[in-house]
């Protein structure tokens, strides 16, 4: 991946920036750049979709869903002895598209077709094994005070109970006036 291309996503760190380039099936890369951009170092080929910080630790969810293949993970970005690294923290059975923090060390992960719950002890629970929303491209997740998680995707929002025991979901569909009805 050419690090001079526009970054898909970036994250400010104490000595510069972590930049993620994600071109889907055409490749990906994660780079560290110093503050003025003159120095850089490639960290990995992970396909980062979202960064998250928990108690000073930097995590990201990553993955690729393409032509029937879906793989992903949660990675941790760490600085040791002045050098940044990106290492897999826990693998997932699908492309990790979004993450939401339930509490410190406890997260909900949205994959291309599933909803997972993971923690820093690397325990993984599959809450919704087949969300059947892959073609809607989930891309964000938020936990609300009402006990629900809301998953943003193409033209829809999915509403799920945050509870581990309740594993159903509802599609929130906007009024027809809001839908993309342009025909080409």
Each PLM stretch: what is its role?
Residues 143-184:
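Blade-level signature of beta-propeller repeat domains, shared across WD40, Kelch, NHL, RCC1
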Residues 2-13, 44-56, 92-102, 134-146, ...:
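Repeated scaffold domains used in trafficking and secretory/extracellular systems
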Residues 1-35, 41-75:
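Acidic, serine/threonine- and glycine-rich low-complexity intrinsically disordered segments
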Residues 108-110, 115-159:
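Ankyrin-repeat and related helical/solenoid repeat scaffolds used for protein-protein interactions
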Residues 25-31, 67-76, 114-119, 155-165:
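Structural motif
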Residues 90-117:
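Loop/turn-rich, solvent-exposed surfaces of beta-rich toroidal or solenoidal domains
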């Amino acid at each position: 991946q050419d690090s001079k291309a526009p970054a898909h996503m970036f994250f400010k760190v104490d000595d510069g920036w972590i930049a993620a380039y994600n071109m889907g099936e055409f490749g990906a890369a994660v780079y560290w750049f110093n503050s003025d951009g003159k120095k850089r170092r490639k960290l990995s080929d992970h396909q980062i979709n979202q960064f998250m910080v928990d108690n000073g630790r930097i995590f990201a969810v990553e993955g690729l869903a393409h032509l029937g293949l879906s793989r992903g993970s949660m990675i941790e970005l760490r600085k040791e002895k002045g050098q940044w690294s990106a290492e897999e923290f826990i693998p997932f059975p699908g492309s990790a598209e979004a993450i939401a923090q339930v509490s410190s060390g406890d997260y909900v992960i949205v994959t291309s077709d599933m909803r997972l719950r993971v923690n820093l002890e690397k325990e993984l629970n599959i809450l919704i094994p087949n969300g059947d929303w892959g073609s809607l491209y989930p891309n964000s997740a938020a936990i609300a005070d009402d006990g629900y998680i809301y998953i943003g995707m193409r033209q829809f929002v999915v509403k799920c109970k945050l509870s581990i025991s309740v594993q159903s979901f509802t599609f929130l569909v906007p009024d027809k006036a809001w839908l993309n009805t342009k025909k080409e």
